Swiss-Prot record:
Fe cation binds at residues 21, 50-51, 127. Disruption phenotype: Mutant shows increased levels of Ap4G, Ap4U, Ap3A and Ap4A. Cells form pellicles that are initially flat and thin. The pellicles finally become thicker, their flat surfaces are broken by a number of broad pits, the inner surface of which are covered with fruiting bodies. The colonies also show a defect in gross morphology, in that their central region is flat ang glossy. Belongs to the Ap4A hydrolase YqeK family. Residues 18-132 form the HD domain. Homodimer. ADP binds at residues 21, 51-54, 83, 109-110, 127, 133, 170-175. Its EC number is 3.6.1.41. InterPro entries: Diverse_Catalytic_Enzymes (IPR051094), HD/PDEase_dom (IPR003607), HD_domain (IPR006674), YqeK (IPR005249). Gene3D superfamilies: Hypothetical protein af1432. This is Bis(5'-nucleosyl)-tetraphosphatase, symmetrical. Hydrolyzes diadenosine 5',5'''-P1,P4-tetraphosphate (Ap4A) to yield ADP. It catalyses: P(1),P(4)-bis(5'-adenosyl) tetraphosphate + H2O = 2 ADP + 2 H(+).
């Protein structure tokens, strides 16, 4: 699937605002992939499809999580996390993407995971720093991403955890595990 086909496919699933975000993530992911030695074509496709399920009804996502035996603890956390694993599932079935590297980059772009691949890190950080994002801490992560993808990832996860904690919201366990894995030098 080429860029134009992928963008046309995903555009049907997104609002105009989210589509603009997706194009920003795509361009940022390609840039990061080239900078840090990841496969830029895989980064392009993963970035295009990363929010494919973002606007699916919560009930549909819940059913997919249960039916496909995705980790049950997903349902105990913010539904904003669900679109990543559900998106990987739907992109495979509806868009025909079969590459596991791409599907994993989509699957873990909201939570991270210990043992993240370079491509997964690229998509996570690209989603966080794409040019249309404007929130406290994003410029610091952009600066880190110029030279050190791991430090950019660590800082983005720290920022996310602090944001959630300040709002007395739970942090998804996989995100804590990812942070610990990263700072332990793994």
């Amino acid at each position: 699937m080429n860029r134009e086909e992928a963008l046309a496919c995903v555009k049907q699933q997104l609002t105009e605002h989210r589509y603009i975000h997706t194009v920003g993530v795509m361009n940022t992911a390609i840039e990061l992939a080239e900078r840090f030695g990841a496969d830029s074509k895989k980064a392009e496709i993963a970035a295009i499809f990363h929010d494919y399920a973002k606007f699916r009804p919560k009930e549909e996502m819940k059913q997919i999580i249960a039916r496909e035996k995705m980790p049950a603890h997903l349902l105990d956390h913010n539904p904003e996390l669900w679109h990543a694993p559900v998106g990987a599932y739907l992109v495979q079935r509806e868009a025909g993407v079969q590459d596991e590297d791409i599907l994993d980059a989509i699957r873990y772009h909201t939570s991270g995971r210990p043992g993240m691949t370079l491509l997964e890190k690229v998509i996570y950080v690209a989603d966080y720093i794409e040019p249309n994002r404007a929130f406290p801490g994003v410029d610091e992560v952009r600066k880190l991403a110029e030279t050190d993808l791991n430090q950019a990832l660590i800082q983005s996860i720290k920022n996310t955890m602090v944001f959630l904690m300040k709002k007395n919201q739970p942090v998804f366990p996989d995100t804590f595990l990812t942070y610990n894995w990263l700072v332990s030098g793994s």
